């Protein structure tokens, strides 16, 4: 039994049930076919009875209508209203007669039914035709106002014959319906016995199938379910026995293989969970340390950014002062240039004065020469006056006066010459000094120009320095922002590392729920922090100072 496969038992069971189902289907089809035939016959008999009865009933109603017309004719009702009523009744009688003929034709054209007496059908047709002809002639005679001919017709005999035949036909029809009902009852009883026998066979087969399922499927499946529940409880120490080549044996073998794989997986997961837990703890510690140092770096960057802002303000102020100094230097240079031009004008004027003084000296020399010659002439005149005696005394007086004037003129000319020479000497000295002052002013102008250029270069350099410091400040601000973001990321990383540590701990606890055979446990190798996460305060401080 252990080597019997479930699929073989299922196929055998399906074959048995298919055979039983086939037999049941054949019997059921036979019973249904018989019932269907009986039902068709009963339906056809009912239809024929309805149509034949309808035709006979319509004929009787038609005769009643005709009798009403005949009664009115007997009463000699000849007024127009009565005549109209009789004509209407005769018309209705004709329509009823046509309807009766229609019902009878439906009966004649209906499906033939086995077991019926053809002679009885012929009698029914003859009685109908007889009654139909009598009623048709009655309508004709009454319309022709031939009451005598109408009275000679024996409608009652025709109706009696028709009713007699109809009663016989109804009796035959009832027998056929009863026969069909009896056949249906017999078929039903036979089907009941057949179904009972088949049900008994099915119960016996089900009992054998149940016993087979107990041994082949249910008991092995219960043992497998017990092993599965044991595995679900975390106990992997129970060994699973796999026997036979059936599906349950294959399932047990697969479950045993799964248990061995699960044992290896749980062992590996347990060891790796320990390693992950250790590494996660170290990562969490490193992330916390990195977060702290990142916060310190962010604080230092904030202070640096503040210092850079102050330095930027100072350099900007120096730039403004340098620009103002450049403007003042330009003003001083322009003033020095103007002073140089004034000194040049003074030098030119002093040169002109020197030239005029030299001309005055020349004129004084001429005056001195004239005075000398006048003195000589006065001396000669005095000599001549002395020679003249009394006559030349007045001339001598004049000559003496002239001589005195000439002497005074010569003396004055000498004094003027001395003064002019002193003036010329001083003018020369002043011209030299003014010339030297002009050279000095030129040197001052050149120096002020150089100072102006240097101040311009200083202002330009200060401006460039201010821009550079602003860029550095912006870079420091961006670094501060990035450091803040890094600090947030490091905090998130630390939180993730802590969460990983918690999850690793939960994984260890989850794996600890499994019980396996004692095996040599592999020690969890602690993971070392990478150099990027190793704290290096000295290096960081040195780099920060360099920055």
From Swiss-Prot:
Residues 30-189 are periplasmic. Residues 215-267 form the HAMP domain. Methylation level is increased by citrate and decreased by phenol. GO terms for molecular function: transmembrane signaling receptor activity. Residues 272-501 form the Methyl-accepting transducer domain. The chain crosses the membrane at residues 6-29, 190-213. It is found in: Cell inner membrane. The modification Glutamate methyl ester (Gln) is found at residues 296, 310. GO terms for cellular component: plasma membrane. SMART domains: HAMP (SM00304), MA (SM00283), TarH (SM00319). InterPro entries: 4HB_MCP_dom_sf, Chemotax_Me-accpt_rcpt, Chemotax_Me-accpt_rcpt_Me-site, HAMP_dom, MCP_chemotaxis, MCPsignal_dom, Tar_rcpt_lig-bd. The modification Glutamate methyl ester (Glu) is found at residues 303, 492, 501. Residues 317-336, 518-547 are annotated as: Disordered. PANTHER family: METHYL-ACCEPTING CHEMOTAXIS PROTEIN II, PROTEIN ICFG. Acts as a receptor for citrate and mediates taxis away from phenol. Also mediates an attractant response to metal-citrate complexes. This is Methyl-accepting chemotaxis citrate transducer. It comes from Salmonella typhimurium (strain LT2 / SGSC1412 / ATCC 700720).
């Amino acid at each position: 039994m252990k080597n019997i496969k479930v699929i073989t038992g299922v196929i055998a069971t399906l074959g048995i049930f298919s055979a039983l189902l086939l037999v049941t289907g054949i019997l059921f089809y036979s019973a249904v076919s018989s019932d269907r035939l009986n039902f068709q016959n009963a339906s056809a008999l009912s239809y024929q009875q309805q149509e034949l009865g309808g035709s006979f009933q319509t004929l009787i109603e038609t005769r009643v209508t005709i009798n009403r017309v005949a009664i009115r004719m007997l009463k000699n009702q000849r007024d127009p209203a009565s005549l109209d009523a009789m004509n209407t009744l005769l018309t209705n009688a004709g329509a009823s007669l046509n309807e009766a003929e229609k019902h009878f034709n439906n009966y004649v054209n209906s499906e033939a039914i086995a077991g019926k007496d053809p002679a009885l059908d012929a009698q029914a047709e003859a009685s109908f035709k007889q009654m139909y002809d009598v009623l048709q002639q009655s309508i004709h005679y009454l319309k022709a106002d031939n009451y005598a001919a109408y009275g000679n017709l024996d409608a009652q005999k025709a109706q009696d014959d028709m009713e007699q035949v109809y009663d016989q036909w109804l009796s035959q029809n009832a027998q056929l319906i009863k026969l069909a009902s009896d056949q249906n009852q017999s078929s039903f009883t036979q089907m009941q016995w057949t179904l009972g026998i088949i049900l008994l066979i099915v119960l016996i087969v089900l009992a054998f199938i149940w016993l087979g399922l107990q041994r082949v499927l249910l008991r092995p499946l219960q043992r497998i379910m017990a092993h599965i529940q044991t595995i679900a409880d975390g106990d992997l120490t129970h060994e699973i026995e796999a026997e036979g080549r059936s599906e349950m044996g294959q399932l047990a073998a697969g479950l045993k293989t799964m248990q061995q794989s699960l044992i290896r997986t749980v062992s590996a997961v347990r060891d790796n969970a320990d390693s992950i837990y250790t590494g996660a703890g170290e990562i969490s510690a490193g992330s916390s340390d990195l977060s702290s140092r990142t916060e310190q770096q962010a604080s230092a960057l904030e202070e640096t950014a503040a210092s850079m802002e102050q330095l930027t303000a100072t350099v900007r102020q120096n730039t403004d002062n340098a620009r103002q100094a450049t403007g003042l230097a330009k003003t001083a240079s322009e003033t020095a240039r103007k002073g140089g031009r004034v000194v040049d004008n003074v030098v030119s004027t002093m040169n002109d004065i020197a030239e005029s003084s030299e001309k005055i000296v020349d004129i004084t020399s001429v005056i001195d020469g004239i005075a000398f010659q006048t003195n000589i002439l006065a001396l000669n005149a005095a000599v001549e006056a002395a020679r003249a005696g009394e006559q030349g005394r007045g001339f001598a007086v004049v000559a003496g006066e002239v001589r005195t004037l000439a002497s005074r003129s010569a003396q004055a000319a000498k004094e003027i010459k001395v003064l002019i020479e002193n003036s010329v000497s001083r003018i020369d000295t002043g011209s030299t000094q003014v010339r030297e002052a002009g050279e000095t002013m030129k040197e001052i102008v050149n120096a002020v120009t150089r100072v102006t250029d240097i101040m311009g270069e200083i202002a330009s350099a200060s401006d460039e320095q201010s821009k550079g410091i602003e860029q550095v400040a912006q870079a420091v601000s961006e670094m501060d922002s990035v450091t803040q973001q890094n600090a947030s990321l490091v905090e998130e990383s630390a939180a993730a590392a802590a969460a990983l540590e918690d999850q690793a701990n939960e994984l260890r606890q989850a794996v600890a729920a499994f019980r396996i055979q004692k095996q040599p446990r592999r020690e969890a190798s602690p993971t070392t922090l990478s150099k990027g996460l190793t704290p290096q305060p000295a290096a960081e401080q040195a780099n920060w100072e360099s920055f």
